[in-house]
Amino acid sequence: MDLDPAHKPSQAEETKEQGNEQGQVEQNQAQQDPTTGPQAETEKAIIPSQGSTIPQKRSAEDEPAQPMSKNALKRLRKQQQWEAGKEDRKLKRKDSRIARKVRKREERDALIAQGINPYANKQKPPSVNVPISLIFDCEFEQYMREKEIISLGSQITRSYSENKNAKYRTNIYVSNWNGKLAERFHQILDDKHQNWKGIDFVEGDFIECAEKAREKMKHENMIEPLQRSLTEKSPWARDEKDPLPLPDPEPEPRPEYSDIVYLSSDSPYTLERLEPNTSYVIGGLVDKNREKGLCYKRARERGIRTARLPIGQYMVMQSRTVLTTNHVVEIMLKWLEYENWGEAFMSVIPKRKGGKLKEQQGASGETQETEEAEAEDPEEENEETKDPDAEASASKQNTPKVEVTSK
């Protein structure tokens, strides 16, 4: 049926149409307003009332903090102090390096002013490999904190550097190379230690390292100090009193390990000389002497000879006589050079420890005391282990060339 365009809707139809439009507008507003409508009612239904017994999930910030022990609080404060002083230590090391460079430059300029070539005759003779092996026993990580493991890594790095530049060079082995220390060298040094010469990193224990060293030492040079060790008195002496008495009797060393000596300050035997074709084991333990006698007991259980450096026979110390790993290595290297324990101790032990040679009777009967040789205090432990080969290479590259006219 055709609609008439002239037809007008009635009043009832207009009222109905207006009502439909108003209802549509209210529905749209209700959907847009989050505080009203079915969505708001749903959210209100989800939110529990104040008196609800439904358990609420508490955030980590709302959890009550567990009380810390005194030791844990003390460690936390020391760590905070260490972190707070990191920048100051960094600046001190930088100032020390600058002062050292200025001093060397002044000395060099003074020689040039005198017409002397400051670089003449500075090349050291090549090192001589000797039939002595030093083994770092690194099976003590469970007894050390992270900071102490970092310190041990730095000591091993310094030991390698000292041995590399020594007049008489030994073979160095690092045993039990499969823990956090190895992971640190992998991450910090990017495995550059694998290119170091004269040092082997072994996953096995120190006995496996000694077996490797036994074959290698057959072809080393027998220098005079070691040659005399074969003909003179016994290379070690039994002390009258045990530094660490144990209830069980001392076992006999196993004959197949007669060429292995475990160094320990708790040993009742004192080294008189270093023996050729012998491996000396150094405990890789940095624990501020918490684990008393750990290395000594470990050696006894394995049937290994033990000995300690003769510090008490030659030195008077104002502080504890426990030395770092790199100090032990340096002392043994110096003995090979001087063949004298007193000179070796004085050239290595830091001056801050207040070490002096024991009093000696003079010709006139008066007591004389040997003056303490100056030993530079080792630099403070760096936060990162550095590659000594890279540092040596950089030092050579930065050395300027100076032409000096001869007289």
UniProtKB/Swiss-Prot annotation:
Belongs to the class IV-like SAM-binding methyltransferase superfamily. TRM10 family. Its EC number is 2.1.1.221. Coiled coil: none annotated. Monomer. The lineage of its organism: Eukaryota, Fungi, Dikarya, Ascomycota, Pezizomycotina. Residues 20-32 have a biased composition (Low complexity). GO terms for molecular function: tRNA (guanosine(9)-N1)-methyltransferase activity; tRNA binding. This is tRNA (guanine(9)-N1)-methyltransferase.
